[in-house]
């Protein structure tokens, strides 16, 4: 396809290996260092991109405190080849933060407010826990269900509303680990994982070029033996069918179609459309349905036009209703999360949006797809979606 000058193109994508938050590979690596390493290495392998041209570094991060505080985007960019004259901002849309970072850069490019951006996100959930420093307003219970801030219970609700069984969830969990392991063994993650130094379980320093979160030994029988994690009386959501708590970062180089053509760069993809949407916080995981419907409408497409989908696996009980109502549940094995998802790889909040988008682009490249959708739910009831076309 030919590019228009203000088209938004993805030049390259990279991510860290996903590390377990409890005693994992990144336990002695700070979030800013992880981010800076990733940005530097991605720029290094794209030598046609001059770091001086970067307009803004836009970095997703949810818990912006401790080492992730004081605008981690700037903290990280100062330790990269990007000059001090380039700007940096940290954004949060909870789980969708780094996809929002992509959308912010895209909107700037579309309106002529910059040509080259570095976007991505990070979350070191081992160093900055999910609830660190959080003080929810009790008055929120006057406006939304009291359990709306408890993600596992919202997944229980959504699964129950849509008749999703425990066995369906367990099968989905096994699938995630099996596909992620298969992708690892077959080298499907090779282009997206930027190797990083870390510490193994014995405390030895080594270079990791794989995700330590994947459990290839996962079986249906093993998952069936797990107790409910959130609702002990009659619950169906377990640790084995929930996204893992992990540490990681993701990064993309994004630019205008005109600048890519000027530099002689062959992009991975162009953004066709973007959308966000809100839903009842009590069923926060349903957000990808309205946001995807909105994004497809803006692109003049239907779900039947889409070759591949990356849906963030917050919970199996959440993902399955979304796939059902997007009318792709029966096409799951052909189109959806072909390299596994967050149940196997984890969900470092600020990282995940760019991570699933980049993984989608690699799936499209490896399988010859033209159109793809990356979408995810967002805590407290939102969805965010990006439609990509491979160039």
Swiss-Prot record:
The active site is at 95 (acyl-thioester intermediate), 347 (proton acceptor), 377 (proton acceptor). The keyword Amino-acid biosynthesis does not apply. One of its GO terms (biological process) is fatty acid beta-oxidation. GO terms for molecular function: acetyl-CoA C-acyltransferase activity. Its EC number is 2.3.1.16. It is an enzyme of class 2 (transferase). GO terms for cellular component: cytoplasm. It is found in: Cytoplasm. Keywords: Acyltransferase, Cytoplasm, Fatty acid metabolism, Lipid degradation, Lipid metabolism, Transferase. Pathway: Lipid metabolism; fatty acid beta-oxidation. It catalyses: an acyl-CoA + acetyl-CoA = a 3-oxoacyl-CoA + CoA. Heterotetramer of two alpha chains (FadB) and two beta chains (FadA). Belongs to the thiolase-like superfamily. Thiolase family. Catalyzes the final step of fatty acid oxidation in which acetyl-CoA is released and the CoA ester of a fatty acid two carbons shorter is formed. This is 3-ketoacyl-CoA thiolase. It comes from Pseudomonas putida (Arthrobacter siderocapsulatus). The gene is fadA.
């Amino acid at each position: 396809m030919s590019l228009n000058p203000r088209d938004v193109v993805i030049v390259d994508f990279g991510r860290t290996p996903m590390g377990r938050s409890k005693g994992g590979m990144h336990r002695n690596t700070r979030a800013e260092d992880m981010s800076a390493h990733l940005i530097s290495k991605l720029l290094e392998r794209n030598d046609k991109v001059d770091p001086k041209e970067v307009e803004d570094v836009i970095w997703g991060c949810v818990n912006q405190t401790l080492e992730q505080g004081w605008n981690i985007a700037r903290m990280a960019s100062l330790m990269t080849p990007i000059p001090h004259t380039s700007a940096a901002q940290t954004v949060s849309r909870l789980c969708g933060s780094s996809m929002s970072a992509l959308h912010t850069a895209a909107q700037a490019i579309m309106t002529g407010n910059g040509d080259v951006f570095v976007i991505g996100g990070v979350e070191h959930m081992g160093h900055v826990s999910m609830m660190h420093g959080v003080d929810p307003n009790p008055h929120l219970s006057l406006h939304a269900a009291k359990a709306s801030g408890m993600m596992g219970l919202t997944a229980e609700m959504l699964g129950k509303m849509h008749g999703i069984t425990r066995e369906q969830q367990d099968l989905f969990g096994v699938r995630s680990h099996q596909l992620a392991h298969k992708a690892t063994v077959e080298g499907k993650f090779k282009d997206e994982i930027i190797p990083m130094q870390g510490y193994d379980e014995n405390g030895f320093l080594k270079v990791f070029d794989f995700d330590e979160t994947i459990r290839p030994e996962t079986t249906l029988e093993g998952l069936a033996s797990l107790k409910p994690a959130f609702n002990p009386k009659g619950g169906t959501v377990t640790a084995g069918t929930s996204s893992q708590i992990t540490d990681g970062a993701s990064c993309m180089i994004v630019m205008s179609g005109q600048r890519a053509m000027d530099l002689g760069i062959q992009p991975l993809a162009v953004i066709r459309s973007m959308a966000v949407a809100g839903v009842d916080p009590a069923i926060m995981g349903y957000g990808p349905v309205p946001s995807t419907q909105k994004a497809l409408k803006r692109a003049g497409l239907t779900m039947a036009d889409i070759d591949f989908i990356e849906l963030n696996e917050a919970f199996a009980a959440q993902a399955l209703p979304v796939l059902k109502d997007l009318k792709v549940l029966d096409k799951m094995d052909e189109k959806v999360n072909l390299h596994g998802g967050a149940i196997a790889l984890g969900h470092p909040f600020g990282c995940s949006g760019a991570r699933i988008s980049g993984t989608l682009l690699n799936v499209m490249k490896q399988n010859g797809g033209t159109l793809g959708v990356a979408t995810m739910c967002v805590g407290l009831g939102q969805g965010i979606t990006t439609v990509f076309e491979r160039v």
